[in-house]
Regions:
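Non-transmembrane, aqueous-exposed alpha-helical and coiled segments at domain scale
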Residues: 1-172
Length: 172
């Protein structure tokens, strides 16, 4: 229980959309930030439990306003990098085989290509109820000084309270 230490706002939503536009991506329609999807899904009662990492991610993202990706380290192939996806790059993001064009979007890449971003994560690296090793990316922006750090601190506290081991690796 308790009160959420962060709250989203129009300023947070605008800064996140600007982050997505950084490389030329257009965050409209079904390509909105995942944090905006969570607001609607929560209001509709459509957020089900997946696993501790994703459930905590959803709570922190919903209240803090920053999109968060969680991938299964046992389904991804190192090395990892964050970069802007080239035009024409896409991947399957759900079990139905739907694809997302990620060209111009800041994304997490593994050795096989892009696998996560602030809109939708790739199906090939998604977590499952049995996932035990995850990599989390909080898609923060320098326009929101301290918010990424605060979001991670809250995420860490919640996961550690559930018995998870958490380590940090910052990138810019």
């Amino acid at each position: 229980g308790g009160e959420a230490p962060l709250a989203s706002s129009d300023a947070v939503r605008a800064a996140v959309r600007d982050l997505l536009r950084h490389g030329g991506f257009k965050p409209t329609g079904r390509s909105k930030p995942a944090s905006e999807y969570l607001i609607r899904a929560s209001a509709e009662g459509a957020l089900g439990s997946i696993n501790a990492a994703v459930d905590v991610c959803n709570a922190v993202s919903l209240h803090g306003g920053l999109p968060i990706s969680v991938i299964d380290l046992d389904r991804a192939t190192p090395p990892f990098a964050i970069a802007i996806a080239k035009e024409g790059t896409s991947y399957v993001f759900n079990a139905s085989g739907q694809t997302l064009d990620v060209g111009g979007l800041v994304a997490l890449f593994d050795a096989e290509g892009p696998c996560a971003n602030a809109v939708k994560d790739a199906q090939r690296t998604k977590t499952s109820p049995g996932s035990t090793r995850t990599l989390t990316v909080i898609w923060g922006t320098s326009r929101l000084e301290g918010r990424t750090r605060e979001s991670f601190a809250w995420y860490r506290r919640l996961l550690e309270a559930l018995g998870a081991r958490v380590s940090e690796s910052a990138t810019r």
